[in-house]
């Protein structure tokens, strides 16, 4: 389908802002150019804010798309490619995936405190047990490697020190040998905690605080949130090509 001049202008501006174009955007442009224009204006805000360096912006978008709650493969590929084009190393991108891979522990961060509540309500628990020497050592090791402690870890450390120890080893790896600066690591956590597919408020506040204490600016954190907010457009990028195909099959318009 030949584009109108207005559609071509939107396409050209989109490529200028985002540096990429694809079939999904083409189908959206054909179906509703006004929608794509409105999205472009929205998405251009973080792109033009430039509080984050371009490479870090792409790393944040990789985390949003690669999170277990989203797993948006087309976006992962696009933003991995863009990050590489902007000079990201294999080690940096691998570290983003390692940091993003910790999301699953929130099953325990949310679930263990609820389990403790149920045990107390059922008369099976009178209060927290005193930590053993091993548990105290694990807590100290966590603080040393991660630089913080949060009450959400208390129950897991008490009830399941084996899992806590294994998770500590898993989650501390990028902090021991990673190449991203600490505040950028925190941006990755903020990105997937803030995403509409997760919305994990306790972790979001914790990692915002960590980032601020590591020197992050308000503008940087706002830009991470702005980037995470764009995830909703994947409703259109996934479905618009399907809609266009079904319209062709049915002869609709």
Q: Which residues fall in each region the model found?
A:
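Hydrophobic, ordered structural segments
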Residues: 94-113
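Mid-chain, well-packed structural core segment of small domains
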Residues: 72-91, 200-220
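Short helix-coil transition sites and intra-membrane helix breaks within transmembrane domains
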Residues: 68-74, 104-108, 196-202, 233-236
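Acidic, glycine/proline-rich low-complexity segments that act as flexible tails and inter-domain linkers
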Residues: 1-56, 85, 108-184, 213, ...
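Alpha-helical scaffolds flanking conserved acidic
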Residues: 54-59, 90-95, 182-187, 219-223
């Amino acid at each position: 389908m030949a584009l109108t001049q207005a559609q071509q202008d939107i396409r050209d501006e989109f490529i200028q802002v985002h540096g990429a174009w694809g079939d999904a955007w083409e189908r959206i442009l054909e179906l509703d150019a006004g929608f794509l224009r409105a999205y472009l204006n929205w998405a251009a805000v973080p792109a033009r804010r430039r509080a984050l360096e371009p490479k870090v912006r792409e790393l944040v978008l990789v985390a949003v798309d690669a999170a277990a709650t989203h797993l948006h493969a087309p976006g992962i590929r696009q933003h991995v490619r863009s990050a590489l084009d902007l000079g990201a190393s294999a080690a940096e991108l691998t570290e983003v995936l390692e940091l993003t891979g910790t999301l699953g522990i929130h099953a325990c961060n949310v679930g263990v405190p609820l389990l403790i509540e149920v045990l107390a309500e059922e008369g099976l628990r009178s209060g927290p047990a005193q930590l053993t020497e091993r548990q105290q050592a694990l807590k100290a090791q966590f603080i040393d490697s991660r630089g913080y402690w949060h009450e959400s870890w208390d129950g897991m450390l008490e009830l399941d020190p084996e899992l806590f120890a294994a998770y500590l080893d898993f989650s501390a790896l990028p902090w021991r040998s990673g190449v991203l600066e600490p505040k950028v690591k925190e941006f990755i956590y903020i990105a997937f905690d803030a995403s509409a597919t997760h919305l994990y408020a306790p972790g979001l506040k914790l990692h915002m605080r960590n980032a601020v204490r590591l020197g992050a600016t308000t503008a940087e954190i706002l830009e991470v949130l702005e980037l995470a907010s764009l995830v909703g457009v994947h409703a259109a990028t996934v479905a618009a090509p399907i809609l266009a195909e079904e319209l062709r099959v049915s002869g609709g318009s």
